[in-house]
Amino acid sequence: MKNQVLFVDDEALILQGLQRSMRGMRNEWDMTFVDNAAAALAFMATHPVDVIVSDMRMPAMNGAQLLGEVMKRYPRTVRLILSGHADQDLILQCVGSTHQFLSKPCDPEQLRATVCRAMDLESKLKNERLQQLVGRMEHLPSVPSLYSEIVDRMHDPETTLEDIGVIIAKDIGMTAKILKLVNSAFFGLRRQVASPAEAVAYLGLDTIKSLVLSMHAFSQFEPDQTNAFSISRLWDHSMQTAAAAKRLVQVELNDRKMMDEAFVSGLLHDAGKTALAFNFPDQYGKILEQTRASSADLLRAELEAFGANHADVGGYLLGLWGLPTPVVEAIALHHQPALTSANTFTPLTAVHVANAILNAGPAGTPVVDAVYLERLKLADRLNGWRETLLNPATAE
């Protein structure tokens, strides 16, 4: 069965151009082209749509409003905005409801690749309930103290972009949304940004203020919303994993770009847990209580209860948001690194090893994928990595 893709644009010439440029995908996609939001919603009422690609500026109902309505009615549909207008108000209006932003005119190959990637992510998460769960998520929860800190600092006229970048780099939810926005086609960057501090410097303080203070991107965490899940504990582990993964890349390759990717991957590697904990608080709380001693038991319990584990959910969600592919892969596969086709040291390697070493602690034995490390010819490096992370003063 072919995937259904719906294109929406009120300009007839643009719509015709899309039809011509996407003609080569007719054997793989069922495509429908409509010229207004009402027609799009009418079509979706009778046809399941996998991906919707909408123009931003349209009469009656603009693209941001349309995708907001699609998110409410059909949360599993992947939502893409196609526009030539880098208007800040419109960007902020659609941050929550849009998975990715594409600029007009959009290179046909980029559009095809983006839609194909979205479909590939969807195929990896077949569970209907989780598809709907992830599709509805506008934000990942943020630690209250960090949220309060960033708001307070923004009211201080002496606060710099670097100050805000440091705060955002400590927070899972803020990092994910800021990276989603700065990597959108609206900003026209020629490379993907993986560093929160660099993203803040590029977006500017006014945009960051609008994002945070309008609550389009972030929300405060309700401490009593879950029983066993602790966002503070997750933050602590995620920060440690991020720093450790970055350090491993520095030791192995000293590649600045990969160091940034490894840091963000480590910071977000357990982001899927927030989706499960926030949407199934009682059920997930019980699972956490029953599987405290073993990550393998946790993965099995998640799979039995939800049809996917937290790594699947996190990778799917952040992939939809358009984070760099190495980051998405590291998040999705950090418990199953052998599933990657890569045969070299990547951010996935760093996060997998860092997570295992930190979970084991000084007295434990890291539970790593030995077959994967053997394939990379890196198995003999494990003890050295462990020494580097747990005893940095004595490591070489």
PLM regions and their residue ranges:
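Conserved alpha-helical "signature site"
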Residues: 108-288, 292-366
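Two-component/phosphorelay signaling modules centered on CheY-like receiver
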Residues: 12-32
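Active-site beta3 strand of CheY-like receiver
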Residues: 6, 47-53
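Alpha4 helix (beta4-alpha4-beta5 surface) of REC/receiver domains from two-component response regulators
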Residues: 65, 78, 85-102, 109
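Active-site residues of response regulator receiver
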Residues: 9, 55, 83
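Short hydrophobic/Thr-rich beta-strand motif most characteristic of the beta2 strand and flanking loop
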Residues: 7, 27-35, 43
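Acidic catalytic/metal-coordinating carboxylates
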Residues: 35-39, 62-66
